[in-house]
Amino acid sequence: NKKRLWVGTNKGLCVFYGDSIIADAHNYKLYNYENGDLPGYEIKCIFRDSQNRMWIGMLGGGFSVCNPSEDYRNLKFVHYSTTDGLVNNMVESIIEDKTGKIWIATQYGLSRFSPDTETFENFFFSASMQGNVYNEHGAAITEDGLLLFGTNHGVIVIDPLKVTSSPMTRNVILTNLKVNGITVQVGEKDSPLTQALSY
């Protein structure tokens, strides 16, 4: 953007203007874990969204976002990881759908991120574990808004308008009951249980 180049390396993110680096090979800025700018070293993907924000996916560091300024040497990043709700910190590709949501494909699962609310929804579209392992730079969007993601088992095609999140509900199962720190059984004197807990 604006002749600025963003290069992902295994040492971090390198940002520079193409013409200036020809004149001076040291005229660039390296953002990485060592200098405290990013939560990781190895950059797996770089994506510019419709708002011109830059999304940086890292191996083990989750992802970071910045609004590029003219001064490429002082970019400020906001970082997101599993602590914030991302499905996995090994980010492989990032893409935006037509509604402005950001999809983050990882080495185990897919996250849909809402930049406005900074919330995540996580998905596992394959019944097999290997089918939920996404490929590096393996994301694309079609003209009609379908998202394509490369996985270890082929391509997953997603219509973002039809994907709904269904909260998982889990049944509570009691396996043991203690009263005043002592396990009680059915049939014992003063036991509150009239039948086994498994019923």
Name every feature range the model reports, one short phrase each.
Residues 12-14, 111:
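Structural signature of outer-membrane beta-barrel domains
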Residues 20-47, 58-61, 65, 71-101, ...:
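Residue-level "micro-hotspots" composed of small/polar
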Residues 2-5, 15-17:
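Sequence-structural signature of mature extracellular/luminal beta-sheet repeat domains
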